[in-house]
């Protein structure tokens, strides 16, 4: 069976819902929490670097970014492997994204507190996107605030119909089936429909721009 991933990132983890389509009906194949860090500080690497000297702060941030990317790729490969062992083919991965972040340097992010929150959110979304590409999956990056609109268009179904579909899926698997799972499932539905490509980027790379690279 062909399946698609739907993913919603948080600081240090992501919600994953795997959906398939059998005889025209969507079904939940799997859903789980994907851990994207090994250490507590890595959930907020910019915050961890906030009070350090510039060189040490940069090293901490870059280490956090590299670790998130590495873990995300490993977790994505494991998820694909699980589906192959079930006899399924993963056709795409939908990742919910936010508005692109300005191309701030690490120093510019650390200088303003709210930027740290934005950068950390972008980090884990970007990690999922990089992992999707590393595993050779078709990426469907969907702006979270446009998810319903894209779903209505891709599925040719009004909002009321989408709500019913998501509710039916939730009843079939039971809790947990909160906002994260619902949004990830809806994103996976969009991905299953075919090569929809949302051109909007997730976020600028969070390891800093060229001014910071040595």
Roles of regions detected by a PLM:
Residues 1-201, 214:
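Phosphate- and other anionic-substrate recognition elements at nucleic-acid/protein interfaces
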């Amino acid at each position: 069976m062909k399946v698609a991933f739907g993913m919603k990132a948080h600081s240090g983890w992501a919600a994953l819902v795997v959906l398939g389509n059998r005889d025209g009906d969507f079904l939940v194949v799997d859903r789980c929490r994907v851990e994207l860090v090994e250490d507590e500080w890595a959930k907020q690497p910019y915050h961890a670097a906030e009070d350090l000297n510039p060189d040490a702060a940069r090293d901490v941030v870059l280490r956090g970014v590299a670790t998130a990317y590495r873990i995300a790729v490993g977790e994505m490969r494991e998820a694909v492997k699980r589906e192959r062992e079930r006899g399924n083919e993963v056709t795409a991965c939908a990742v919910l994204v936010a508005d692109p972040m300005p191309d701030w340097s690490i120093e510019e992010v650390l200088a303003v507190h709210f930027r740290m929150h934005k950068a950390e959110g972008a980090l884990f979304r970007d990690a999922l996107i990089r992992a999707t590409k590393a595993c050779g999956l078709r990426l469907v990056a969907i702006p979270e605030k446009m998810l319903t609109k894209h779903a209505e268009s891709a599925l040719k179904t009004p909002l009321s119909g989408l709500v019913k579909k998501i509710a039916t899926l939730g009843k079939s698997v039971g809790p947990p089936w909160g906002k994260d799972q619902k949004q990830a499932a809806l994103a996976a539905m969009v991905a299953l429909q075919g090569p929809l490509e949302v051109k909007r980027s997730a976020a600028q790379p969070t390891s800093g721009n060229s001014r910071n690279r040595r």
